[in-house]
Amino acid sequence: MEPQPATLWRSEADSRIERLRKGDLVVEVRGHDGALVKDARVQYRLKRHEFLFGTAIAYSPFADTGEDGRNYRQFILDHFNALVCENEMKWYATEVEGEGVDYAPADALLAFAQENGMAMRGHCLFWDKLQFVQPWLAALGRSELRAAIERRLTDIVTRYAGRLISWDVNNEILDGGFYGQRMGPDGTAWMFREAARLDPKTPLFVNEYAIFGESEKTERYLDLIRDLRARGAQVGGIGVQLHDSDRLVVDGKMTLAPAGRPEWMVSTPITAESFIATLDRLHGETGLPIQLTEISAMLPDATRRGDILEMIFRLGFSHEAVHAILLWGFGEKTHFLGPDAALVNANGALNAAGIRISHLLREEWTTRGDGMTGTDGRLAFRGFYGKYEVVVRAPGCEAVRELRLTKSAPSAALDLPE
């Protein structure tokens, strides 16, 4: 199938965004006596999207007390409403030697998220690849390993219960196998069941890479979810990574990174149509919400990098089953794929890719405006779903309020003080 022209896939995505991510809100202004107030000036601006746009955050650059640290934190505050710890909640980070657990870095990052009204994903309870399993853990026998897993689950799940929007339970199972080989075919399902018992309210996710453009692996992913559910696992969502996004066909061509491309990256082209078709299939056959959990684009040309990231964001934001899109880092000095994956240069300035994403999040996909109430005391506007700051000015008084625009709340009353 030939890829769609950019103007076509983009216009179709934008139409879906307009339909799925925006709504009409009627603000009704009343005086302290309950009377409707006409000719009141109402200013409104979106403070926080309902949809989650986020990034992985790492403790070392976050805690930097110099200019680099300030730039790192400010870019996050300026652009995102969701975070995920890049490594700090992983078992190999919290319990390096099997003697004592350190949650201080993860606690600090979660506190930062909560202080700034950001959601936090939990990543990850376990990682199924042997190279990411601590030597002391890999050396345990089966019964000892099970006991260690139980202790890990009880410790970290209860510690963060009610404070996370999701947990990745066993990361990258399809290309892993450590826990499956050691614990048997029910091992991962047991992890899900135990995590759900310890924290019934936090959705539990699977999380895999190389799904887009790979029909065979998509089928394996669906088989995994079916098997987990058949074993009583409460799978609450599907995580989809995309680090090898240089495979995306943009403007009719694919531009693979010329050098330094990790061997685990695949090279099958991804068109806009196949991207949407994969999301359709994952959601259609499971009914589960989807989060684009780890997004990167590694190319030396920052403009082309921006083209690819914009395509991912626009397509993901336009799909009804996708609830979140998270970059896996952004800084030239800190990105795990190196400078060719950065949005922010070493001096803190946005490069062409960063400018593109910043424009989407702070200009194109935001809502701000003002107007006057009519004789019925009402002002109507259309905007993105989320939290708004509304300022109302009428003769002799001014009020600042927070309102939420949701599909279930198309109107809001605002009472002025005496």
Regions from the language model: what does each represent?
Residues M1-P61, W91-E95, R121, M183-D186, ...:
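Beta-strand-rich domain onsets/edges
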Residues V26, R48-D107, F112, M118-A119, ...:
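N-terminal substrate-binding region of glycoside hydrolase catalytic domains
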Residues L52-G54, A82-V84, G117-R121, L164-D168, ...:
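Structural preference for beta-strand elements that scaffold enzyme active sites
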Residues E95-E97, V101-P105, F132-T202, V206-D223, ...:
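Active-site cleft segment of glycoside hydrolase catalytic domains centered on the general acid/base Glu
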Residues E294, P300-D301, R305-D340:
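Substrate-binding cleft of secreted/luminal carbohydrate-active enzymes
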Residues E364-D376:
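Short, acidic Ser/Thr/Gly-rich low-complexity loop/linker segments typical of extracellular
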